[in-house]
A protein has these predicted regions:
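Beta-strand-rich domain onsets/edges
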Residues: 290-317
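Structural motif
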Residues: 307-310, 319-333, 417-421
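Short amphipathic beta-strand segments in non-cytosolic proteins
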Residues: 333-352, 433-435, 439-442, 446
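Structured interaction patches on ligand/partner-binding surfaces of diverse proteins
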Residues: 377-404, 487
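Hydrophobic/aromatic-rich core segments of domains that either
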Residues: 156-173, 184-194, 200-294
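Short Pro-Gly-centered beta-turn/loop motif in secreted/extracellular proteins
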Residues: 357-380, 464-466
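Secondary-structure boundary elements
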Residues: 2-199
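Aromatic, loop-rich ligand-recognition surfaces of beta-strand-rich domains
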Residues: 403-444, 450-499
């Protein structure tokens, strides 16, 4: 407390630092729920990220690295680490350094004039992203990356006063860096922190953290937006969001380009809810939930989040009312109901609403994913409906358990978006025919000009000339990713077979 009071006194005593005083208050008022961990075991496990790119060159897979680290240092456990609270450990020197550097970049960069003080406090000023171990990071990152924006600041063509233009210029440079993306990372680790993040290795969390550290160190406002669960998957996903000087929302899934949200397929991606991480505590949400129940699921316990689902969904229900006929009978012990998404063999709360056992409505929910209603009682979920989905037409489809057996045909057992990179690689591929095994004389039978469809694509030969040999040549960097090829006679129902 004494250290934090030093910060307030320093800026309060000088009238020219009135904004810095307000910024200091913003950080301190929202600091109580921030914690972090320290310890040798954490440092040992974080070497995983710094060694990823080296391991790739040696063809060592991430899971093998995790297994090796576990054998060497033992299983990872937060209980073995030192638990620290920001309000106890953050000293005046650290906080003042962070505030002074944040103000420096906000005031010196030309696009800073289009960043409000409120946005500055939320999206540039914070000294941390999540629960990473604290360190001084702003000056080092500023000196390393600020030269990347020299050409932008000198430009007479680009709108150097637009934060999005600065973000695009910077991220176009960051995209050129060597990186290693993998969803296979040690489980249970806190955020890796600014130094490890610059190894540009890990999952979407680590790569998003990297972009945020660099952008904020250079005075570019940004946030981490996330879906707690994919609508058609078992995991969540996160990315970095930006706004231009007019307030239009953009996003980047590093190392992709920055794209406008409303014009991208992100809006159509299957999901239930999207939230934005904020440094400030959502006191309105916290007060409303605590009014209804003192026991809240961990995800909503200290909500440093705001709901931005409406910004990321084209088809969503402003108010999703759950019919009383779908609810199980009984009396809930909690007045909070949670909308849950499927996560492997369990259900994970992603939204909440007031519940009296009969009336229930959730706000801003993207339809189509499978969901279920639950309350949080005695430390576990108590379910109030069978799993259900809402169709585009607004009808509920309930999956009621049955003892009967039903045969089904599965056309996919893996997220379909993973197929796209292979389908796109075939564009430009060509089928050729010849009567010469060396194809010294050949004829184009079919050129792939658009992305093939899933499962099966019908292709009709351009030539009616009989040929004995057929080959497929993939485009440059296409890798010839073809699973199966079958040939049919005109009007034939059975595939031809070679000799």
């Amino acid at each position: 407390r004494v250290e934090l009071e030093k910060v307030l006194h320093r800026y309060q005593s000088n009238p020219s630092d009135s904004l810095k005083y307000k910024a200091a208050r913003f950080l301190i008022e929202n600091m109580p729920s921030y914690t972090y961990y320290k310890g040798k075991l954490l440092e040992q496990y974080l070497t995983f990220f710094t060694l990823l790119q080296e391991a790739r060159s040696k063809k060592v897979y991430p899971q093998a690295m995790i297994d090796s680290i576990r054998r060497m240092y033992g299983p990872f456990s937060l209980d073995s680490l030192q638990y620290c609270k920001d309000v106890v450990t953050v000293d005046s020197a650290y906080l003042c350094n962070n505030i002074d550097w944040a103000f420096k970049v906000w005031q010196e960069q030309p696009w800073g004039k289009n960043v409000s003080f409120a946005d500055f406090c939320e999206y540039i000023l914070p000294y941390r992203i999540g629960d990473e171990t604290l360190s001084y990071w702003r000056e080092d990152i500023y000196r390393k990356y600020n030269p990347l924006l020299d050409s932008l600041r000198a430009s007479t063509v680009l709108d150097i006063e637009d934060p999005l233009v600065a973000a695009r210029c910077l991220c176009d440079s960051l995209r050129k860096r060597s990186r290693f993306f993998t969803t296979t990372v040690p489980q249970g680790l806190p955020h890796v922190g600014p130094e490890i993040a610059q190894s540009v290795s890990g999952s979407c969390r680590e790569l998003s953290d990297y972009v945020v550290y660099v952008c904020r160190a250079l005075g570019i406002p940004c946030a981490i937006d996330f879906m707690p669960l994919h609508g058609g998957g078992n995991d969540g996903h996160q990315w970095v969001s930006f706004t231009d000087k007019y307030g239009t929302l953009y996003f980047q899934e590093y190392p992709d380009k920055i794209k406008e949200v409303r014009k991208d397929k992100m809006c159509g991606a299957s999901k239930i809810k999207v939230y934005r991480n904020t440094f400030s505590l959502n006191r309105i949400m916290q007060a409303e939930m605590q009014r209804l129940d003192t026991a809240v699921v961990p995800f909503f316990r200290d909500p440093h989040i705001v709901d931005v689902t409406a910004d990321y969904a084209k088809t969503y229900k402003k108010k999703l009312e759950i019919p009383a006929s779908m609810l199980y009978s009984g009396k809930p012990r909690s007045r909070i109901a949670y909308l849950c998404g499927s996560s492997r063999m369990d259900w994970e709360p992603v939204a909440w609403a007031e519940f009296d056992g009969e009336h229930l409505a959730f706000s801003d929910v993207q339809i189509e994913p499978v969901m279920r209603i639950a309350t949080y009682e005695r430390g576990r979920l108590r379910y109030w409906t069978d799993p259900f989905e809402m169709t585009v037409s607004g009808e509920f489809h309930v999956f009621t358990p049955s003892d009967s057996v039903q045969d089904v045909t599965l056309f996919a057992k893996y997220p379909l978006w993973q197929d796209e990179k292979y389908q796109k690689r075939m564009i430009g591929g060509v089928f050729e025919g010849s009567n010469d095994p060396d194809f010294r004389q050949k004829e184009v039978l079919f050129l792939i000009e658009k992305q093939p469809e899933r499962l099966r694509t019908m292709a009709y030969s351009r030539s009616l000339t009989p040929c004995r040999y057929v080959r497929y040549i993939g485009p440059e960097k296409g890798h010839c990713n073809v699973a199966e090829i079958e040939f049919y006679e005109a009007g034939g129902l059975l595939p031809l077979s070679g000799r």
